[in-house]
């Protein structure tokens, strides 16, 4: 089974692209969704122990947790030390299930693939991109988003240009949904061809 890492900076269309892979029948593990699930499950007591008062009714309150780690590099590192191994274990279980089921390709949707050392876990990398102004417009249209928040997020991410340089495949969502879907289909066809499936 070929493990495809899907990544891209905020606002570039990674989530939309992940849905396109799923709609084409490729299993997709969404790291962000896994975090949400873990926050209401096994991660909750671990997060509460590290950040008292951030769990309400057995579920991590993301706003309270965010207030505790935002701008505090040491706190963020503590949180990542709790969450990243759990997400990785969740992804490993996902891959094992789909490998056993005989899938030819599976996608790990990892927003911070390069930043968290995830490159070594995948066979190929797809980077989703779009022009910087398109990214800015998309992100600033989100509720509660500001120029300052966007700048802070981008400062923690590998620049888009560098991600594109490291990619095996690039999908430009700035060209529209149909063009992006055609690129997804072409990648799937190429990878299935490599496996002889």
UniProtKB/Swiss-Prot annotation:
Transmembrane segments: none
Catalytic EC class: transferase
Record-level Gene Ontology MF annotations: ATP binding; dephospho-CoA kinase activity
Pathway as given in its UniProt record: Cofactor biosynthesis; coenzyme A biosynthesis; CoA from (R)-pantothenate: step 5/5
Reaction(s) the record says it catalyses: 3'-dephospho-CoA + ATP = ADP + CoA + H(+)
Keyword Signal among UniProt keywords: no
PANTHER family, per database record: BIFUNCTIONAL COENZYME A SYNTHASE-RELATED (PTHR10695:SF46), DEPHOSPHO-COA KINASE-RELATED (PTHR10695)
Membership in a protein family: Belongs to the CoaE family.
Record-given protein name: Dephospho-CoA kinase
């Amino acid at each position: 089974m070929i493990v495809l890492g899907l990544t891209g900076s905020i606002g570039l269309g990674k989530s939309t692209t992940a849905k396109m892979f799923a709609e084409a029948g490729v299993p997709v593990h969404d790291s962000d969704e896994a975090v949400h699930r873990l926050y209401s499950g096994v991660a909750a007591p671990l997060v509460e122990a590290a950040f008292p008062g951030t769990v309400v009714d057995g579920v991590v309150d993301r706003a309270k947790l965010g207030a505790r780690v935002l701008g505090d590099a040491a706190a963020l590192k503590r949180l990542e030390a709790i969450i990243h191994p759990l997400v990785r274990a969740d992804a490993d279980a996902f891959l094992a299930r789909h490998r056993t089921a005989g899938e030819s390709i599976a996608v790990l949707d990892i927003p911070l693939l390069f930043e968290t050392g995830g490159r070594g876990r995948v066979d190929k990398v797809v980077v989703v991109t779009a022009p910087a102004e398109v990214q800015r417009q998309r992100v600033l249209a989100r509720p509660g988003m500001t120029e300052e928040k966007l700048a802070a997020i981008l400062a923690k991410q590998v620049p888009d240009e560098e991600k594109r340089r490291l990619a095996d495949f690039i999908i430009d969502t700035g060209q529209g949904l149909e063009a992006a879907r055609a690129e997804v289909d072409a990648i799937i066809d190429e990878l299935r061809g490599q496996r002889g499936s």
